[in-house]
Every structure is written in C-alpha cells, then in structure tokens.
C-alpha cells in the first residue's frame, strides 16, 4: 500500500477527529473510530481489546469481520496483541512469513477450547500478512490494544501507524475508569410477553452466564449481567446506573480499575451478536436499561 501524503493524512485525520467528537458516547465513538480508519485510511480490519484480569485481553469492538467475535480473549504476552500489551509499545509485522507465524500464534492462543465451552472463538484473518498492534495507555496504565491486520503485504506505512496511534490516544481517556459518569437514575419495572421462560445459569466460580445452556459471557461482564438479571427476577427492576454497579460490594473484587462503561459495551455487543432477545440499552449518561423479550428464570451455582 502506498504511503499517505502528509497533507492528505492531516486532512483525513481532522475529519476522523471531527466524527469522533460528534459521537454521543463511548460505544458510538468506538464504532465511528474503527469505521473511519477503514473509510479514510484503508485500514480495513481492526479490533479493540481491553484487559480482562487474569484472562489477558478481550475483544470489545471490531470492524471488517463477520459477527460473533466480541468477547474473544488473547493471553498477555502471546501473539502480536499480547506482546504489545505486555511491552506497552507499538509493534508491527510486515514480513510475510513472520506475519503468518504471528497470526497463527494469535489464533492458537485466543480463546482456546477450555473451561467447558466458556470461550468465544477468535475471528481474525488467518492469512494476514501485515499486522499492527498499538497499546492504549494513560501514563503506564494499559487500557487496551488497538489492532489492525491485512492480507496485503506492507499494508501499513509509517503514517498509517501514526494515525492508529492517534486514535488509540483519543480513546484512552474514554477507556479510563476515571471517565465514568455518576448519574443516579430511578428504577422501573418491565413485564415481557409470553414466550417460554429464558433459563439463565450463573456459575460464581468464574462469573460465567449461560442462556438455555449456551455460553454467553464470563468475568466482570458476566457479573454485571448476573447482577441486573438477579434484580429483574427478584423485583422486576430494569433501570440501572454505572455508579451503583461500582459501589456494589458484590462486584468490588471484579471491578478494580476496570472501566465499567467499556465492559458494558462488551456485554451489550455480545448480546446483540448472539442473544438479541436480551438487550442492554442506554437511557442516558451513566444509565442503562435491561430489556427482555422473555421472562427469565435464574439458577445459581
């Protein structure tokens, strides 16, 4: 791919910045940022990973891939994504054979078949020949990794790398736990219609959630989903705030310095992709609502 001319790159970067600033929230900014990288800079395939505790990093957003990969995980130190996270610096691969080896390493390490089906398959490009992994940092704190790949050799020049780094910098503050809103919101009650009840299984050992026996999600997003479903089953409540989740003693061990808004986006997108009959929708800054097309029966183990 030809290197971007300085003036062209700057004009397009200004347009990307304008689009991101116009986005209403983090979820929208992620979608706009990745779509604009493809449209304006021909960076066609991108993923954003965020830390997931001991599980390494997990995919929160992607562009240019088939649906189904949100929530896939990559261990720290493995593959280009894991190494960029561990070293906290930008890494690139443009060599064909080395690039293929890196891709194989990512696919081998990402969401392996373990934990009795509690993992989501990685959806990256198997024959990628160009890769770019940029850590999202505030100071020395790792907030994520912005990853790009392409089947074309030499797809990313120096200015492509700079543009992806600038987008990573722009997303850093949004992904910081300090950026979350603390707006209160009143509870509400919902009564979905008469399909067969949704059987929800929750396993406390790894905070994993299953719908009708099918794995949904685990770790902090699983704890959040369990919390709101528990409140819904007990009282019919459907409206919640990020502030109350952060203050919930049952979630304290999971949250740490994690950004709840980012984990909520991961949960929302995972539900959209695989379980559209359960939805997490925004109702305001720092507020969200649980929507179900079926009543739920919760089992805990």
Regions found by a protein language model. Name each.
Residues 165-172:
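Allosteric cytosolic regulatory segments
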Residues 22-60, 68-69, 78, 178:
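Helix-loop-beta substructure at the N-terminus of cytosolic sensory domains
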Residues 214-247, 267:
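Short amphipathic alpha-helical recognition elements used for nucleic-acid or partner binding
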Residues 183-185, 216, 231-232, 253-301:
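DNA-binding patch around the recognition helix
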Residues 118-121, 129-137:
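A short, aliphatic-rich beta-strand micro-motif
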Residues 51, 60, 67-124:
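Regulatory sensory and allosteric helical modules in signal-transduction proteins
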Residues 1-5, 126, 143, 149-165:
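Regulatory loop-to-helix N-cap segments in sensory/regulatory domains
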Residues 1-28, 39, 59-60, 143:
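Signal-transmission linkers at sensory-effector interfaces
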């Amino acid at each position: 791919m030809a290197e971007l001319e300085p003036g062209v790159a700057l004009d397009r970067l200004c347009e990307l910045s304008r689009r991101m600033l116009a986005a209403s929230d983090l979820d929208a900014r992620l979608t706009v940022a990745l779509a604009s990288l493809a449209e304006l800079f021909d960076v066609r395939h991108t993923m954003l990973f965020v830390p997931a505790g001991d599980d390494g990093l997990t995919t929160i957003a992607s562009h240019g891939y088939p649906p189904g990969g949100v929530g896939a995980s990559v261990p720290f130190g493995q593959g280009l994504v894991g190494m960029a996270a561990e070293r906290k610096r930008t890494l690139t691969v443009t060599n064909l054979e080395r690039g293929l080896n890196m891709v194989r390493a990512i696919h081998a390490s990402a969401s392996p078949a373990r934990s009795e089906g509690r993992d989501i398959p990685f959806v990256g490009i198997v024959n990628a020949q160009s890769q770019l992994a940029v850590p999202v940092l505030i100071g020395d704190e790792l907030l994520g990794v912005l990853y790009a790949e392409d089947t074309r050799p030499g797809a990313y020049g120096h200015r492509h790398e700079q543009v992806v780094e600038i987008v990573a910098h722009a997303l850093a503050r949004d992904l910081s736990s300090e950026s979350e809103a603390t707006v209160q919101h009143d509870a509400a009650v919902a009564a979905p219609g008469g399909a067969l009840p949704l059987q929800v299984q929750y396993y406390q050992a790894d905070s994993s959630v299953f719908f009708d026996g099918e794995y949904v999600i685990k770790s902090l997003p699983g704890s959040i989903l369990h919390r709101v479903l528990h409140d819904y089953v007990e009282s019919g409540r459907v409206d919640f705030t990020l502030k109350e989740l952060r203050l919930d003693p049952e979630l304290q061990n999971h949250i740490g310095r994690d950004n709840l808004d980012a984990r909520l986006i991961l949960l929302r997108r995972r539900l959209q992709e695989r379980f559209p009959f359960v939805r997490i929708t925004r109702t305001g800054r720092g507020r969200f609502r649980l929507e179900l097309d079926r009543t739920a029966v919760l089992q805990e183990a």
